[in-house]
Regions:
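Mid-domain Rossmann-like dinucleotide-binding core that forms the NAD(H)/NADP(H) cofactor-binding site
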Residues: 40-125
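A general structural signal for well-ordered alpha-helical segments in protein cores
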Residues: 5, 26, 38, 57-60, ...
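Glycine-rich phosphate/adenylate-binding loop and adjacent beta-alpha elements
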Residues: 1-38
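Short, well-ordered beta-strand micro-motif
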Residues: 30, 40, 245-247
Length: 251
């Protein structure tokens, strides 16, 4: 009723499918309140193009949307996995001056450099100095924390310029602490929370118009009858995997 879909008090609303309601990978699903939570894929959008619209791409779109990115900004994205790259692609829609993406995994940084040469890449151990050298305002104007580690949470506020926006979309295994005495003079704005599905129709429109393309993230494809091998590959991050698409079972 108020647009805060994630905080819906109805037991069948909000975080329902795959969360409170089991069966996120079932053959058939019944979608409660489908007029709000279900979006038709346009005819000109393939299944592979639409695959991430309801999850990691929606997260990236939401992160960029609430981060108040302006032309001329330097945007730092912490995490070069699928969600980080989706955040990067959606940040590009706002035409910032520069995007920097940070990750400890050389393979993921190489993935970004090979496909998005205008994006700067750096590892966490050199991030703070690198961001300052490549930001006209002495730090990132916007930081999107997507990695979810203790180090990335600390880097988020350390690499931000005074009065920057720090958007936290990551999930953490442990509680994080804001060292307010160390941050006192930076006057940072923190935004955080879980993404909803309210922008899915707009995301699909952008895909249909060629403004968003996440198909490069699909590095591996498995039939449904080999899904256990797909899970093993993804969990162990072998063979440069980013995302795995599952197709109908092969006979």
């Amino acid at each position: 009723q108020h647009g805060f879909v994630n905080n819906c008090t109805d037991p069948n609303g909000g975080w329902a499918l795959g969360c409170r309601i089991d069966g996120g990978q079932a053959e058939y699903v019944r979608v409660p309140y489908a007029d709000q939570g279900l979006t038709v894929i346009p005819d000109r959008v393939s299944d592979r193009q639409a695959l991430f619209a309801g999850d990691v791409l929606a997260t990236g779109y939401w992160a960029a949307k609430i981060s108040e990115i302006r032309q001329g900004d330097t945007v730092l994205i912490l995490g070069a996995g699928p969600t980080g790259i989706c955040t990067m692609l959606c940040a590009m829609l706002h035409h910032p001056h520069r995007i920097i993406i940070c990750d400890p995994d050389p393979a993921r940084l190489r993935f970004v450099r090979e496909r998005y040469p205008d994006v700067l890449t750096i590892t966490p151990d050199h991030a703070q100095e690198f961001v300052q050298l490549n930001s006209p305002h002495g730090g990132a104007d916007v930081v999107c924390e997507v990695a979810g580690s203790n180090e990335s949470f600390r880097l988020a506020w350390e690499c931000a310029r005074p009065n920057a926006v720090v958007t936290v979309v990551a999930l953490y295994d442990k509680p994080q602490v804001l060292p307010l005495p160390d941050m006192y003079g930076k006057n940072l704005i923190f935004k955080t929370g879980g993404v909803d599905g309210c922008d899915t129709a707009e995301i699909l429109r952008l895909i249909e118009n060629g403004q968003l393309d996440t198909t490069p993230l699909i590095t591996h494809i498995f039939p449904l009858n080999e899904i256990e091998a797909a899970y093993d590959l993804f969990e162990k991050r072998r063979d440069g995997v980013m995302k795995v698409a599952i197709t109908p079972p092969e006979k």
